[in-house]
From Swiss-Prot:
This is DIS3-like exonuclease 2. Residues 1-168 are annotated as: Disordered. Belongs to the RNR ribonuclease family. DIS3L2 subfamily. Keywords: Cytoplasm, Exonuclease, Hydrolase, Magnesium, Manganese, Metal-binding, Nuclease, RNA-binding. Its main location: cytoplasm. Its cofactor is Mg(2+); Mn(2+). It comes from Schizosaccharomyces pombe (strain 972 / ATCC 24843) (Fission yeast).
Length: 927
């Protein structure tokens, strides 16, 4: 199929601290490899408190602009897909007409010249004050260090193999400063002149932030200030004075191309390097900076784990202006990573694997539409870009599976078959539960236990039960697959599960954490078969209040019915069993028995939900997409999934089970328990969200989780449903990410708190088939019941937590990028089917700034940007002084005015003209 899925990757919902903390159980099947109606939407069976689509790859394209993050407002509408930018600075009036002609050079831009005041906390002021006294000595130190490296370096090896380029050190000028030595770093951290944080690079590639734990983030402006650091590196930064800002303003031309003369392999790239810098730096002339204290990277404490880098290869001299130009003088190819937070990479002609040789340039040109992997090998202080070695060819960028494999590779997710060593740990295919094992457990095989899951789910790891007792009370049970019976500590199977850490759900398939024999058969709580389980029982009244002690223990169960969410919802809505479900029931149970159980559980779950929000939990609904695929695996239907009472039923009891287990294991193992926490929002992020709503004449109180939720309730009653959907997704971006942690790493139990759920103790217990932390928690719970040691020390518990946090973030990135990929293909298929060039959709204006309008498209739960300056059908436009509206004149002299929150029609199309996939948005139809 001739599709070129190069849609712009949607910004990660959780990449910039956007992981929401609600437990939702969606009815989309995220548990099966081959689905009739597959999707990557959140399944509350996972009990994942990051249910709201959020840090790689995200729900809202450039949503940070909506929240008016200062850095992004200065980017002047330049997108991250190497789009050609007009780099002409204009006068600094608040609003002006922008006449546009058909010729590119006749355009003018709107720009705002008002400078934002520098915001500094006391600790920043003190640090900068200290630094200002020593700036001269520091600069001298850097200069002397660079000279020392030059004097000691008589040659520079360009890369591995035989590609060694000899360059006289006297002809070199360093692009980047040397890193501080360990003694200087230690002294600076102790004195408060240096700070340690995690570097977060935005997708415009220029802007970055050094994220701190207890103080406001530092703004790191540009690649020179980043000093060869990558996204997620743990870095040491030094605040800089305004007049010492590492933006090197004197080193940049007005069009944003750096003047620094680079006497290394960069020289061989010739004019191509200048164009690469234009693409990467964008419009520096229109960049106004950030109000936060600026800093520069002076050392790298820990490199982020970078898997293979995926991208496309271009011949030397290539540019978007002239894709056919080739520089015969250069010995270096240009590699453009798919991840826009990564720099361009140069590759010597001898390091191009099978493409090397006498005809290396011709070979590159023949493979212009292929995806490759690359490993970075070296980054000299004399070279603006790192050097690398070409890896494997992944396939054509028009192939969905090739692109999917690229997503997996760049995020370090293994899709390889399980090894023989792992498979040898499994029981035989005909395994059955022994009588000896049944005697060790509580026998629940005759109890009425049901599962409620997505219709096409294969790995059923949780079930529920409800039995009426005396005096209007009930025994409610949650039963979880006993995975640890099969996955023994330190076995090859255990190590593989720990390495994978999570099942990854793509639109078209799932990559399981455990072999199919376990996740689809022996551990799956399929109906009418005996299965091992780990159960939790509560005695509850009709209001959901606990009466008496909880019971935890190993059980053997036999579920009598398997229901899909839609079927359970039909029962809740009063439909008969035959109309709603129409399935046979196992054992001696009747349809009436099952209906009564579902209705009772639903009623109790409503009380639990109401009580949870009354105690301060945050309710934020997320937009979730589901796709229907045809027989060729292509999307022929895409829609937003809606939560129902059946979803909430499972959600509440999974939350209750996770909280109950967390309280139990942390009481028994206070220093060795693996829990999940969610910190309160950072003041900066929440203030930006509140400020945005203030501009909408709405006062949002975020002083506590209870106040936050109360404000969300008021929000829903004030604005229409589609705007509320937008605000809810923006609210997610103001929240931190929830994370796994070892209790021994936090001395104060208040740090264990889960902000969004408003729980003091929380963990993941209910999805051991597809989450490794749940396996650890099962082991801790079992050992606590046996009154033995925890079986895991604090150090290893901390390592597991950190590893699982990283794997979860990467899996979320892949899942969201997979959705973006299929959405782009769906749009392309729609246009092809209807013989159109674009798809009409309704949108809301969420931000008007400079030369662009940010829009939210509720039909697909995505944000996009309408670039007014690059559309030749727009003659001129005038932005109001307060950025509240824009008046647009088309070349047919028709006019339209668009104000914030206005609903209007835009047109989506899949853009294959650049590198990589991109969903673009136009104000005027392309048809």
């Amino acid at each position: 199929m001739d599709l070129k899925p190069n849609i712009r990757r949607k910004e990660k919902r959780n990449l910039l601290k956007g992981e929401a903390a609600l437990e939702k159980k969606g009815s989309i099947d995220r548990k099966t490899k081959n689905k009739a109606y597959p999707s990557t939407t959140h399944d509350p069976h996972q009990n994942d408190d990051s249910n709201i689509p959020g840090l790689g790859s995200g729900l809202l394209e450039r949503i940070k602009d909506i929240v008016q993050r200062p850095t992004d407002t200065q980017l002047k509408g330049q997108d991250s897909n190497h789009k050609k930018a007009s780099l002409t600075e204009t006068k600094t009036e608040k609003a002006k007409v922008k006449p546009k002609a058909k010729k590119k050079n006749s355009k003018e831009k709107i720009s705002k010249s008002s400078k934002q005041d520098e915001h500094k906390t006391d600790v920043h002021k003190e640090s900068v004050s200290k630094l200002s006294k020593n700036l001269e000595s520091r600069n001298n130190r850097d200069e002397n260090s660079a000279k020392r490296e030059k004097n000691n370096s008589h040659q520079v090896e360009a890369d591995t193999n035989n590609a060694t380029e000899m360059v006289s050190s006297n002809a070199k000028k360093s692009v980047y400063p040397l890193y501080y030595d360990s003694a200087t770093v230690k002294k600076g951290l102790k004195s408060g002149t240096l700070f340690k944080g995690t570097l977060r690079i935005l997708e415009n590639h220029r802007s970055a932030f050094a994220c701190m734990e207890d103080i406001p983030d530092f703004y790191v402006d540009g690649p020179i200030a980043r000093n060869r650091a990558f996204h997620n590196d743990v870095v040491i930064v030094e605040p800089v004075m305004n007049n010492d800002s590492p933006t090197e303003k004197s080193n940049f031309l007005q069009n944003g191309v750096e003047k620094v003369k680079i006497k290394d392999h960069d020289d061989e790239l010739g004019g191509a390097m200048e164009h690469l810098e234009r693409l990467e730096i964008k419009s520096v002339a229109s960049f106004k900076g950030d109000s936060r204290t600026r800093a520069r990277v002076v050392a790298i404490e820990k490199r982020a784990e970078i898997s293979k880098i995926v991208g496309i290869l271009r011949a030397p001299g290539w540019s978007l202006k002239n894709v056919e130009y080739v520089s015969k003088k250069s010995s270096y190819a240009i590699f453009i990573p798919k991840d826009k937070r990564l720099p361009f990479i140069t590759i010597h002609k001898n390091d191009l694997s099978d493409l090397s040789g006498e005809n290396w340039i011709e070979n590159i040109l023949k493979h212009h539409d292929q995806l490759f992997s690359v490993e970075i090998t070296r980054w000299s202080i004399y070279s603006r870009y790192p050097m690398g070695v070409l890896g494997e060819k992944l396939g054509n960028i028009t192939d969905v599976e090739a692109y999917t494999n690229a997503l997996l590779l760049e995020n370090g997710i293994s899709s390889s078959p399980f090894s023989d060593e792992v498979l040898n740990c499994l029981p035989p295919d005909d395994w059955i539960i022994s009588h000896e094992e049944i005697k060790k457990r509580r026998d629940l095989r005759n109890e009425l236990i049901i599962t409620i899951d997505p219709e096409t789910a294969r790995d059923l790891d949780d079930a529920v039960s409800c039995r009426a007792l005396d005096n209007g009370t009930y025994e409610v049970g949650v039963h979880i697959a006993d995975v640890t019976h099969f996955v023994k500590p330190d076995s090859a199977l255990d190590k593989e599960a720990a390495s994978r850490a999570t099942t990854v759900y793509l639109v078209q398939k799932a990559i399981p954490m455990l072999p199919p024999l376990l996740c689809e058969r022996l551990c799956s709580l399929n109906p009418n078969v005996e299965r091992l389980a780990f159960s939790v029982f509560w005695k509850l009244d009709s209001n959901g209040k606990e009466i008496g002690k909880r019971w935890f223990g190993k059980t053997v169960i036999k579920t009598c019915a398997r229901l899909a969410y839609s079927e359970a919802q039909g029962v809740i809505e009063g439909k008969s069993w035959d109309d709603a479900v129409g399935k046979p029931i196992g054992g001696t149970h009747t349809p009436k028995d099952v209906e009564t159980s579902i209705l009772t559980l639903c009623e109790i779950s409503r009380k639990l939900r109401k009580d949870r929000f009354a105690k301060g939990a945050v309710e934020i609904n997320s937009t979730e997409l589901k796709f229907q695929l045809d027989e060729y695996g292509m999307p022929n239907k895409c829609e937003v999934y809606e939560q129902t009472d059946a979803n909430h039923l499972i959600e509440e009891f999974m939350l209750l089970a996770n909280r109950s287990v967390a309280e139990h294991i942390s009481k028994n193992f206070s220093n060795n328990s693996l829990l999940r926490r969610h910190a309160s929002p950072k003041e900066k992020q929440i203030n930006e969200f509140c400020h945005f709503l203030k501009s909408m004449n709405f006062d949002f109180d975020a002083s506590s989780s209870a106040a936050f939720n109360a404000s969300m309730v008021r929000l829903r009653s004030t604005f229409n449903e589609e705007l509320v959907e937008l605000f809810e997704n923006m609210a997610v971006r103001s929240l931190n990410r929830a994370e796994y942690f070892c209790t021994g790493d936090f001395g104060e139990k208040t740090d264990w708190h889960h902000y969004a759920l408003s729980f003091n103790h929380y963990t993941h217990f209910t999805s051991p088939i597809r989450r490794y932390p749940d396996i650890i928690v099962h082991r801790l719970l079992e050992r606590s019941l046996k009154n033995t040691s925890p079986g895991i020390d604090k150090k290893n518990c901390s390592l597991v937590a950190a590893h699982c946090n990283e794997k979860k973030e990467k899996s979320t990135t892949v899942q969201e990028d997979s959705q973006q990929l299929f959405l782009s293909v769906y749009i392309a298929e729609y246009c092809k089917k209807h013989d159109k060039k674009s798809m009409p959709v309704q949108a809301f204006a969420t931000r008007i700034s400079g030369n662009s309008i940010d829009v939210y498209i509720s039909e697909y739960g995505i944000s996009n940007r309408v670039d007014l300056s690059s559309d030749d059908r727009i003659k001129s436009f005038i932005v109001a002084p307060d950025d509240s509206s824009v008046k647009i004149t088309l070349f047919d002299d028709s006019q339209k005015t668009i104000a914030l929150t206005d609903r209007f029609q835009v047109y989506l199309y899949s853009d294959y003209s650049r590198t990589f996939f991109s969903i673009r948005c136009s104000l005027v139809s392309l048809n």
